[in-house]
C-alpha cells in the first residue's frame, strides 16, 4: 500500500523538539562535537510527522529535523479526539501500546509518546511503553503505531457494518464494563 504524499504548505504545522543530543566523533586532533535532534511536526487535526536532524549547531539541527518531519507526514484517523482502536507496535526493542480513551481523560503518555500524539491532535489517549524507553525509538514506535491505524469507515466496511453501528457497539461495551 503506497502512502499518500501530504503537502506541508497546505497545513499549519507546529514544531516540537523531542530531544537534543550532543554527539561526538573522535578524530586525530581530538573530538568533533555536533548536535542530533528529534523533531515532531503536526497540525493538531490529524497530520503528524517525525524527523531527525544533525548539525554542528543546535538551530541548524532543529531546522533539518523539522524539514525531514515535513517530508514524512502521515494522516492519523481521529474519532472524537482519540484513536479509533487499540494498537500495539514494536520498533527495535521498544513496544508501544495506544488505546482509545473516554472524552475528558486527557493524554496519559510518557515523554516520547506525548509530543507525537498531541501534534496529531489526539486529546484523549491511554498509552504504555514496554521494553526500551530510548526517546528516539519511542517516537518512531509511536509514529509507526499511528501510521498503522485504520479509520472507522475502513473498520466498519471490513465487518460489513456502518460506522454508526460500530460506535454504538463500542459505547455499549464500555458502559457494560463500567
From Swiss-Prot:
The keyword rRNA-binding applies. Residues 156-178 are annotated as: Disordered. Keywords: Ribonucleoprotein, Ribosomal protein, RNA-binding, rRNA-binding. GO terms for cellular component: cytosolic small ribosomal subunit. PROSITE patterns: RIBOSOMAL_S5, S5_DSRBD. One of its GO terms (biological process) is translation. Residues 13-76 form the S5 DRBM domain. It holds the Pfam family Ribosomal_S5_C. It comes from the Bacteria. GO terms for molecular function: rRNA binding; structural constituent of ribosome. InterPro entries: Ribosomal_Su5_D2-typ_SF, Ribosomal_uS5, Ribosomal_uS5_bac-type, Ribosomal_uS5_C, Ribosomal_uS5_N, Ribosomal_uS5_N_CS, Ribsml_uS5_D2-typ_fold_subgr. Coiled coil: none annotated. Belongs to the universal ribosomal protein uS5 family. Part of the 30S ribosomal subunit. Contacts proteins S4 and S8. The N-terminal domain interacts with the head of the 30S subunit; the C-terminal domain interacts with the body and contacts protein S4. The interaction surface between S4 and S5 is involved in control of translational fidelity. With S4 and S12 plays an important role in translational accuracy. Located at the back of the 30S subunit body where it stabilizes the conformation of the head with respect to the body. This is Small ribosomal subunit protein uS5. It comes from Chloroflexus aurantiacus (strain ATCC 29366 / DSM 635 / J-10-fl).
Amino acid at each position: 500500500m503506497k502512502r499518500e504524499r501530504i503537502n506541508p504548505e497546505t497545513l499549519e504545522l507546529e514544531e516540537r523538539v523531542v530531544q537534543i543530543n550532543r554527539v561526538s566523533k573522535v578524530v586525530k586532533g581530538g573530538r568533533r562535537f555536533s548536535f542530533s535532534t528529534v523533531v515532531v511536526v503536526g497540525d493538531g487535526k490529524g497530520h503528524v510527522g517525525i524527523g531527525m536532524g544533525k548539525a554542528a549547531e543546535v538551530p541548524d539541527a532543529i531546522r533539518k529535523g523539522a524539514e525531514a518531519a515535513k517530508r514524512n507526514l502521515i494522516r492519523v484517523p481521529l474519532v472524537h479526539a482519540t484513536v479509533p482502536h487499540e494498537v500495539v507496535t514494536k520498533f527495535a526493542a521498544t513496544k508501544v501500546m495506544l488505546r482509545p480513551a473516554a472524552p475528558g481523560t486527557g493524554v496519559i503518555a510518557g515523554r516520547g509518546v506525548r509530543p507525537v500524539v498531541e501534534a496529531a491532535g489526539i486529546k484523549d489517549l491511554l498509552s504504555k511503553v514496554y521494553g526500551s524507553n530510548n526517546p528516539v525509538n519511542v517516537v518512531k514506535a509511536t509514529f509507526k503505531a499511528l501510521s498503522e491505524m485504520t479509520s472507522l469507515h475502513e473498520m466498519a466496511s471490513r465487518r460489513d457494518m456502518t460506522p454508526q453501528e460500530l460506535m454504538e457497539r463500542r459505547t455499549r461495551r464500555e458502559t457494560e464494563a463500567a
